[in-house]
Amino acid sequence: MKEALSSLPLTDAELVSQVKARLYPLTPFTQFLEWLIERLPRKRVAVRLTPQANVAEIDEMAGEYKAISEEPSFQVEIDPLFAKGGWFYLEAALVRHTGDREARFFGKGGRDRRSAFEIPIPSNLRGTVREVFYLPGPVSSLSWAPMHAPGFFSQSCLLVHRISAAESFLRRAHRVVLTLISMRGSRGEARHGLTWQGAAVKLQAAYLQTAQLQIQRYRGHDYAEFIARHDAIKPSELEAMTASIQAAEAQPLISLIMQVRDPQPTFFSEMLGSIRSQSYRHWELVLSMDESVSADCRQVLKAAQREDSRIVVVETHDLTCKAAGLNALLRQIRGDFFAVVSQHDLLPKHALLCIASAVQSQPNAVVVYGDHDCMDANGLRYAPHFKPDWNPDFFTAFDYMANLRLWHTAAVRRLGGFRLGFDEAECYDLTLRCMASCGQEQILHVPRVLYHQRDLKGANAGSPVSMHEPQGGDAGLLALSDHFRESGATVVAGAMPGLYRVRHPVPSPVPLVSIIIPTRDKVDILKACVESIQHGTDYAAWEMLIVDNGSVEPQTLAWLEQIQKDVRIRVISYPGPFNYSAINNFAVQQANGEVVVLLNNDIEVISRDWLTEMVGHALRPEIGAVGAKLLYPNDMVQHAGVALGIGGVAGHVHRYLGGTEPGYYFRAIATQNYSVVTAACLAVRKAVYEEVGELDAVNLKVAFNDVDFCLKLLKAGYRNVFTPHALLYHHESLSRGHDDTPEKKAIFEQEFGYMKTFWGQISDPAYNPNLSLEFEDFSLRRF
């Protein structure tokens, strides 16, 4: 019988150490509690797994597999301790690359030995499993299902102990209490029936409910639940915002302009009602309409005008030129700021109050925008677009602002208003011109849903990507080309309609680039990396510094000697313990290039223009680090930007997404600014690298050094950028945990703690606060 990794002959101590090293670290206090609880009587259970026909082995020693069907499973050999049934505690590292995280045990047992049972096993974002479960003895069969979908996954040995009733009670009670505390103020439905009273009476039922709550997060977050818990502004907050605005010397007048053409009476009336019910009272609505407007709609509008003098109607006979019509309205308004709204869309009651509050905090604002969602004909809200704070590189790849978007009226009039010739891209063109004439701090983002985009066709219900159907692609391309006319950048259509690719110029002759590759033995991996650069890169002026950190294998040493026949390649020695930061700093000091590229030795080139693309960005004066799009060998995303806060410090967004999939509102296929990009493939000007103090070789020898470096670049005033157009493979093991030995785990915990202490809680301008810090897929914040 061929057995999985868990059957390898390890001692108890070795197995425990191996598994625990891969688990997400506990807090010091929880670690102390864990030490106390483990003093209670317990016995380790030998877990031997045999993969079934629906599981294909990739690397058995590393615990890597591929699920061929939606029901991948392993048969569990029935150890005598399992056969008895009772309470057990499972610890394991389980990484699934499909987004599905629904693991479970299932089998048969009980008095008749034939009663089927199924036990859900949740995990956290990092794939750490720490779960108490009960087996109804005697157990006659048992299987382990790591997920409920086809795709790649990896797992450690399953570390299982048969535990006492006391340990079971303490562990279950601890999680139930923590969950209840975290859910204070949540609706009853959001709790899945979990209450303090219920937990006191039926602890096991409450514990299973906490497992279901965790699994529910994996299945996708319910936007209706999110709305109920996070959408409304508390009365006290509303009162404070209102009082603050009223205390100011002047309250900004907000003008809403609208071109009305053949509206549906019901939705048109709802739109008017949503504006008239605004908590903020200093607004005006200026509309233009033509003969297509029905008598019913005219009656609705007249009634609204009689009741509200803030509504102004301008009759027109031609709405065929949108820009001309908008300019006619622009001449009529009195507001300090204005927005273009559509005839069927809605504004939540707090929308203009939030805008006024934002403007009060930054009186010099030129552009202000909020988040938005979609609404069907029945008023159902879905497909929220939670946007980043001002993200100039993303905006020049995609008009992500959409609605609600406001401009400073005087600034727009100085620019000449809306330009003709940019049909369906009038707002994009206007914002690009504002962007060119104002400072970064003058473009504000309010991270709340302030606009409901009506979707009467139901076209957007299936996918968040389709929620914003890009329009005016050619006009947008024209506007963007005009924006970059003086810089010399060229603009071409992007991967999907409405997306754009900006190619920033590289001077001639091209500057020298120094590619730095730390390595130790593993010559096959290094050779593939180097040869892919030699033969798969169209950028001519590069040198390579291979930094040998103590290779001893004869074949590696021979290859390192031979590869230097290529005059572009040097091998330099850095002996001593592994210190990623020190190794790279040492190499940068010896680099001759204007631009340096930090590169892992397990990278392989996909796109020939990867280096040209990265250098074009790196040479921009305002840019610090440039990150590439990295794929696993199975073409799933390994790196497409890093968001702060995910998993405690930072996490790779869109990890395990299909390599060509657009991601959350195109963010996996569009150039954009991220606070952090990975140093597995990172380009930066050498002078900038040295300016911010290099990588931290004292506090961050192994992990988080790229996060720290990128944050130092931000602090120095640079922007970091991710480009999907520099595409490479990263042959990082799919099963790679943070650390796989006690020594590495200790280093990780020290460096994790340093980042938390030194940088603290940093909000990420590239990642909306309404999005999850548990998951990397842009799912919604839950608690």
Language-model-detected regions and their locations in the chain:
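A recurrent flexible, glycine/aromatic-enriched loop bordering the glycosyltransferase active site
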Residues: 323, 381-410, 581-583, 589, ...
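Cell-envelope/extracellular polymer assembly enzymes that use nucleotide-activated donors
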Residues: 252-257, 284, 429, 511-516, ...
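Short, acidic, metal-binding catalytic loop of nucleotide-sugar glycosyltransferases
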Residues: 272-282, 361, 531-541
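Conserved donor NDP-sugar-binding/catalytic core segment of glycosyltransferases
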Residues: 346, 350-382, 440, 456, ...
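Short aromatic/hydrophobic "clamp" motif used to bind/position activated sugar donors
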Residues: 338, 596
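C-terminal, non-catalytic tails of nucleotide-sugar-dependent glycosyltransferases
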Residues: 2, 184, 188-249, 468-510, ...
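A short, conserved alpha-helix in the catalytic core of glycosyltransferases
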Residues: 411, 421-449, 480, 610-614, ...
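Glycine-rich, basic loop-to-helix element that forms the pyrophosphate-binding segment
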Residues: 316-333, 574-591
